[in-house]
């Protein structure tokens, strides 16, 4: 039992350990339950092993924190992100969820031509500025905005599109990047996802203006690839309690695959998850403060 915990906590950052560690919170809960069961039956050695395993796993998990109150003045930007799940045909109810958020910018992922048509028709009147890159392979992407783009472009990471948009918010430029990294469902896809995260680094680091990166990165905050990406790009994670997004199980989800990452002294005053009708992901809604004297 202790050897399993050591494997989960200290195994090299490779494909199979990465898959197992994705559910580290659930593994920790299982070890804790086992320790209670062993204590109940007075199996002291097994209980000690399970408790030690619980501790080894628990210290690997970043503790979600509530955003700190920020008394500084500055502009606010409300950003919504949702992975709609390409086969999902609940177009109207999913789009209504986005509209009801009153977000300034909406990032949508897994957009095919059917979703592109529905999004343009239903979101277009309220969000007239849009960039849509539909795909049939679950990696189509779209960005809708109430605010006009200063400029917007599509870039590619190992063949997968991302959208980079610049806005003027309160008299300063702000950048929003929407990206959907490859799901590591195989050994090759695992390496492709890591190459994409590596390729994101120079894009993010190319400017010092406040940047908001949103998307399904198909990695968890305690994954080595995620930590390296944040460290090298200068982005800061904004994990908070209740930010787990996949798989969507009604009001719950198991692991945080979708992220809101910030740089340039931008800060999140709140991040909440919400149900996306028909999708296997929960969405994220972030309130972002842009300090007056941010670079």
Range-by-range predicted roles:
Residues 75, 79, 85-100, 108-295:
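Soluble catalytic domains of enzymes that build or remodel membrane lipids, polysaccharides, and related
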Residues 1-122, 292-294:
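N-terminal, active-site-proximal structural segment of metallo-dependent hydrolase catalytic domains
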């Amino acid at each position: 039992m202790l050897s399993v915990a050591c494997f989960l906590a200290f195994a090299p950052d490779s494909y199979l350990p990465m898959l197992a560690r994705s559910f580290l919170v659930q593994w920790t809960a299982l070890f804790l339950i086992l320790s209670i069961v062993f204590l109940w039956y007075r199996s002291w050695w097994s209980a000690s092993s399970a408790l030690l395993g619980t501790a080894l796993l628990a210290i690997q998990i970043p503790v979600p924190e509530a955003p700190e109150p920020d008394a500084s003045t500055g502009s606010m930007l409300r950003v919504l992100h949702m992975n709609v799940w390409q086969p999902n045909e609940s177009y109207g109810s999913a789009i209504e969820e986005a509209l009801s958020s009153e977000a300034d910018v909406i990032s949508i992922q897994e957009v095919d031509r059917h979703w592109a048509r529905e999004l343009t028709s239903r979101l277009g009147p309220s969000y007239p500025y849009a960039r849509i890159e539909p795909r049939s392979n679950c990696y189509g992407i779209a960005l809708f905005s109430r605010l006009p783009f200063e400029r917007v472009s599509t870039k590619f990471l190992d063949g997968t599109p991302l959208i980079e948009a610049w806005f003027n918010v309160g008299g300063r430029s702000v950048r929003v990047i929407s990206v959907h990294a490859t799901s590591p469902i195989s050994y090759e896809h695992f390496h492709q996802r890591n190459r994409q995260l590596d390729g994101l680094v120079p894009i993010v680091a190319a400017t010092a203006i406040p940047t908001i990166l949103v998307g399904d990165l198909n990695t968890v905050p305690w994954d080595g690839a995620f930590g390296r990406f944040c460290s090298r790009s200068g982005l800061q994670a904004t994990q908070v309690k209740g930010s787990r997004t996949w798989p969507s199980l009604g009001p719950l989800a198991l692991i945080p695959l979708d992220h809101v990452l910030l740089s340039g002294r931008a800060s999140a005053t709140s991040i909440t998850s919400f149900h996306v009708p028909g999708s296997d992901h929960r969405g994220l809604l972030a309130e972002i403060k842009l300090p007056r004297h941010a670079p």
